[in-house]
């Protein structure tokens, strides 16, 4: 599973890379520090999943979500933000986010989410789990 991380915080990006490194089948293929880079990276790399910050330079994660969702309907989009307000959650999920997490309280759920995604993908491909 190819993953792009779009977040303007280098510390957060490093933590996410560390969390995902130990998950078999997950490969971080790109990083973006602002909204424009995120849209370009998604269009160029065609990932399976994106971890998307809500507040970034050059536009919001919601702007990225609205720009890419029509082009990539099967893309798994995990919004991970320090702004977990209900109105943002509702707006992101309505715009097509697959999941919405509070960085400060739910960050450690990310490995389990990706474990589930890998497991579900293996079930969808006959014989994939047999190696």
Q: Which role fits each region the language model picked out?
A:
Residues 1-12, 16, 20:
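Conserved acidic segment of CheY-like receiver
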Residues 25-33, 41:
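Short hydrophobic/Thr-rich beta-strand motif most characteristic of the beta2 strand and flanking loop
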Residues 34-37, 60-63:
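Acidic catalytic/metal-coordinating carboxylates
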Residues 45-51:
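Active-site beta3 strand of CheY-like receiver
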Residues 57, 85:
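The feature encodes the CheY-like receiver
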Residues 87, 105-115:
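C-terminal output helix
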């Amino acid at each position: 599973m190819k993953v792009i991380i779009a977040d303007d915080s280098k510390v957060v990006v490093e933590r996410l890379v560390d969390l995902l490194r130990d998950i078999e089948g997950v490969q971080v293929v790109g990083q973006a520090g602002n909204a424009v880079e995120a849209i370009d990276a998604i269009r160029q790399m065609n990932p399976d999943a994106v971890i998307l910050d809500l507040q970034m330079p050059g536009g919001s994660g919601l702007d990225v979500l609205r720009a890419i969702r029509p082009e990539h309907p099967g893309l798994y989009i995990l919004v991970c933000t320090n702004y977990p307000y209900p109105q943002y959650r509702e707006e992101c999920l309505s715009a097509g986010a697959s999941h919405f997490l509070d960085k400060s309280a739910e960050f450690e759920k990310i490995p389990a989410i990706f474990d589930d995604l890998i497991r579900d993908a293996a079930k969808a491909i006959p014989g994939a789990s047999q190696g």
